[in-house]
Amino acid sequence: MKHTPCVPKRRCRMLLAAAVMAALLSPAASPRAEAAAFDAHYTSASLSVQEQEAGNLLNSDRGRYNLPALTIDPELSRIARIKSQDMLAGGYFSHTSPTYGSVRDMLTRFGYPYSAASENIARHSTLEKAQAALISSPGHRRNVLSTTFTKVGIGVATTPEGYVYVTQIFCR
């Protein structure tokens, strides 16, 4: 007899997100354990297809201004992915996470060394529209086109309806 789960996929995702958030909020959770919980679908050295595409869109915008491509850092992308997943699971859209604080707080918490850092976040129906919105906003555009940063982390989370949460963390 074939087992068919009676719980819809959306409910499973919500239960998984709630379980991950509960584990992350426990006092015993270490930064590495937190990252591992959100990294279930990827190794720390890999990017999803959407994250690769988002990185290509960002570097394409830089190329239009004759700027060098930023190096897409896997560890920084892991942190950016955690931020996107946190916004999706937590139902918020802000540069300040109720769980992790600011981008600098997150980098410190996860032990990522940096001398300069900034963050872009976008929520849209497609990656292309998210990047277009970022490049159209003066503050976000400044980050995308900055010569201060040499590395970027890209994190993407997708809602059941197909909307994307994109986090770009820029560092030097």
Specify the residue positions occupied by each region the protein language model found.
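Sec/Tat signal peptide C-region and signal peptidase I cleavage site
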Residues: 29-35
